[in-house]
């Protein structure tokens, strides 16, 4: 577990000016990106609309993880890119459920595809954590469950403004208010980063990779 000094340091960094501006920028990006996607020339083309939507998911995932780790060395960009991949790859389950590469079929499903079940996020993150412990990878890859959790959660919350959250086995919530989506997305990296500090994940990342959490 993290020491009391590390916990205090986490609190100071979480509420730092840099964190506030980074989170504000993320929230502003969400707003601007959604407005851009409402442009007529995007809405008139299915593939362009799908591409812009996936790109927004990707950028939000990348931005969120960048807030968590900071961008101090070349390997950090690889982690940020991986977070963006996790955030956008979820939508491939549309094609899996449709059993077709047709975009029309993938976007006109009778039910939501499996990776859009929000209950899976903590389940998969915890399963990944236990698997890493079993394979003795918990130190070198301790960031991975958190990266997946943040990337997938940001995707689900953004989808939630249209469809609500699918909480198995209870069903779907009402669509999320837009302001709540922006607030959750902007604050999620800092909240998770703080929890990482309090649980000792930050310390492992620092000692193994020289990563300094910048929240």
From Swiss-Prot:
Keywords: Membrane, Transmembrane, Transmembrane helix. It comes from Xenopus laevis (African clawed frog). PANTHER family: TRANSMEMBRANE PROTEIN 267. It is found in: Membrane. The keyword Membrane applies. The chain crosses the membrane at residues 77-97, 114-134, 178-198. Its main location: membrane. This is Transmembrane protein 267. One of its GO terms (cellular component) is membrane. The keyword Transmembrane helix applies. InterPro entries: TMEM267. It is a multi-pass membrane protein.
């Amino acid at each position: 577990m993290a020491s009391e000094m590390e916990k205090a340091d986490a609190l100071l960094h979480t509420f730092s000016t840099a964190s506030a501006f980074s989170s504000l920028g993320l929230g502003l990006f969400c707003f601007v990106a959604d407005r851009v996607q409402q442009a007529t020339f995007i809405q008139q083309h299915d593939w362009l609309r799908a591409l812009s939507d996936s790109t927004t998911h990707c950028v939000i995932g990348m931005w969120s993880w960048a807030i968590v780790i900071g961008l101090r060395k070349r390997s950090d960009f690889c982690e940020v890119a991986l977070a963006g991949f996790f955030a956008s790859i979820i939508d491939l389950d549309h094609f899996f459920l449709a059993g077709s590469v047709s975009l029309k079929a993938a976007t006109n499903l009778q039910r939501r595809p499996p990776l859009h079940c929000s209950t899976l996020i903590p389940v998969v993150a915890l399963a990944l954590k236990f698997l890493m412990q079993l394979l003795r990878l918990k130190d070198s890859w301790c960031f991975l469950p958190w990266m997946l959790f943040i990337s997938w959660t940001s995707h689900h919350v953004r989808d939630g403004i249209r469809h609500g959250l699918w909480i198995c086995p209870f069903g779907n919530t009402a669509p999320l208010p837009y302001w709540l989506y922006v607030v959750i997305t902007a604050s999620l990296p800092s909240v998770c980063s703080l929890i990482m500090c309090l649980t000792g994940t930050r310390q492992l990342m620092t000692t193994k990779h020289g990563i300094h959490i910048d929240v």
